[in-house]
Swiss-Prot record:
Reported function: E3 ubiquitin-protein ligase that mediates ubiquitination and subsequent proteasomal degradation of target proteins. E3 ubiquitin ligases accept ubiquitin from an E2 ubiquitin-conjugating enzyme in the form of a thioester and then directly transfers the ubiquitin to targeted substrates. It probably triggers the ubiquitin-mediated degradation of different substrates. Mediates the proteasomal-dependent degradation of ATG6, a component of the autophagosome complex. Requires TRAF1A/MUSE14 and TRAF1B/MUSE13 to target ATG6 for ubiquitination and subsequent regulation of autophagosome assembly.
One GO BP: protein ubiquitination
Organism of origin: Arabidopsis thaliana (Mouse-ear cress)
The protein's name: Putative E3 ubiquitin-protein ligase SINAT1
Gene: SINAT1
Matching CDD domains: RING-HC_SIAHs, Sina
Pathway of action: Protein modification; protein ubiquitination
Binding site for Zn(2+) 2: C145, C152, H164, H169
Description of how the protein assembles with itself and partners: Interacts with SINAT6. Interacts with ATG6 and TRAF1A. Interacts with WAV3. Interacts with FREE1. Interacts with ELC/VPS23A.
Length: 305
């Protein structure tokens, strides 16, 4: 092995504060591409694949952040996985103890790395320890499945989720920017908490989810209809929608901006950001003997200029 490689191994495996910092950085400088000169960029390096792999936890394969732990033989892993493996090194089976890999933490501090959502469109580069915070709010990050009828764990981009809703949840897809839906329930007095996603609308080349829910608002049973946009909040603000329900020369109307599916259906419901219909009024609109819910909700979506 070359002398430089041996020095790097010793530096990465050591947790001693007396190790020469220039030795610890030797391999990084050899395998990393310097950034352009500028404020705050001196001494920072774009990560090469080799250094990047050193920072991947061998158990969960996620990038490691302080405290980075190591066993007496120098094998590293993240603090979360240290608990999962019951303090035993998964590589050599030695007891882990409480040894910090300070050298690797210092190496990470010198790196600038791309966002994990680079393949989805994010082209920004971040200092290693700022990357995680950015990714929690990156506008290119994956979306959660917007289906409201169950706690679905599927995530992905919008085309993936549209196919998932259609194929796995059997949600109706509708082309157009107007809707006219009739809700029928034979036992409305027994429905205290329920949620339905009736359809997904393809409108202006984008997708919108129409929700209808029954829940208690304080002591009053109510129904609520609202729209969510399959995209981020900034894009959602480019659209508006209206909802209307009524009968017997009376009607309720609602106009607003669709919420992004970044906000869960429960969050939208709890904020009361939609058309709210008291159950007694809904049954009045239903006609007949008020024992069956027959509620027609109409509306449209338009694009703000």
């Amino acid at each position: 092995m070359a002398p430089g490689g041996s020095a790097l191994k010793e530096a990465l495996e050591s947790n001693s504060t007396g190790v020469d910092y220039e030795v610890k950085m030797a391999k990084v400088e050899a395998n990393s591409k310097p950034t352009k000169s500028g404020s705050g960029s001196i001494g920072k390096f774009h990560s090469s694949n080799g250094v990047y792999e050193l920072l991947e936890c061998p158990v969960c394969t996620n990038l490691m952040y302080p405290p980075i732990h190591q066993c007496p033989n120098g094998h590293t892993l993240c603090s979360s996985c240290k608990l999962r493996v019951q303090n035993t090194c998964p590589t050599c089976r030695y007891e882990l103890g409480n040894i910090r890999c300070l050298a690797l933490e210092k190496v990470a501090e010198s790196l600038e790395v791309p966002c994990r959502y680079q393949n989805l469109g994010c082209q920004d580069i971040f200092p290693y320890y700022s990357k995680l915070k950015h990714e929690q709010h990156c506008r290119f990050r994956s979306y959660s499945c917007p289906y409201a009828g169950s706690e679905c764990s599927v995530t992905g981009d919008i085309p993936t989720l549209v196919d998932h809703l259609k194929d796995d949840h059997k949600v109706d897809m509708h082309d157009g920017c107007t809707f006219n839906h009739r809700y029928v329930k034979s036992n409305p007095h027994e429905v205290e908490n329920a949620t339905w996603m009736l359809t997904v609308f393809n409108c202006f080349g984008r997708q919108f989810c129409l929700h209808f829910e029954a829940f208690q608002l304080g002591m009053a049973p109510v129904y609520m209809a609202f729209l969510r946009f399959m995209g981020d909040e900034n894009e959602a603000k480019k659209f508006s929608y209206s909802l209307e329900v009524g009968a017997h020369s009376r009607k309720l109307t609602w106009q607003g901006i669709p919420r992004s599916i970044r906000d869960s259906h429960r969050k939208v419901r709890d904020s009361q950001d939609g058309l709210i219909i008291p159950r007694n009024l809904a049954l009045y609109f239903s006609g007949s003997d008020k024992e069956e819910l027959k509620l027609r909700v109409t509306g449209r979506i338009w694009k703000e200029e």
